[in-house]
Amino acid sequence: MAVKMRLLRVGAKGQPSYRVVVADERSPRDGRFIEIVGFYNPRTEPETIQLKEDRVKYWLSVGVKPTDSVRILLRKANMLS
């Protein structure tokens, strides 16, 4: 099973916020996931990024690949070099 760390869109129409989730790459964007590891709200000033640091590090250590957008968020949160 190939697993990715990616964004799941939540919120009202035109007012998106996102959950950072670990999911099978074959699942649809807003479909089934394994675990919620964080939250991202681009609409606040400054944008809100909340991550469960221990769980993110665990999933990265077992080989989960983050998507490009999640990789940018992890860099902003100083969790990736």
UniProtKB/Swiss-Prot annotation:
Check the record and name the InterPro entries matching this protein: Ribosomal_bS16, Ribosomal_bS16_dom_sf
Gene Ontology BP term (one): translation
Pfam families documented for this protein: Ribosomal_S16 (PF00886)
The record's GO molecular-function terms, alphabetically, read: structural constituent of ribosome
Domain of life, per lineage: Bacteria
What UniProt keywords are attached to this protein's entry?
Answer: Ribonucleoprotein, Ribosomal protein
Protein name from the UniProt record: Small ribosomal subunit protein bS16
Record the organism: Coprothermobacter proteolyticus (strain ATCC 35245 / DSM 5265 / OCM 4 / BT)
Q: Write the lineage as a comma-separated list.
A: Bacteria, Pseudomonadati, Coprothermobacterota, Coprothermobacteria, Coprothermobacterales
The gene behind this protein is: rpsP
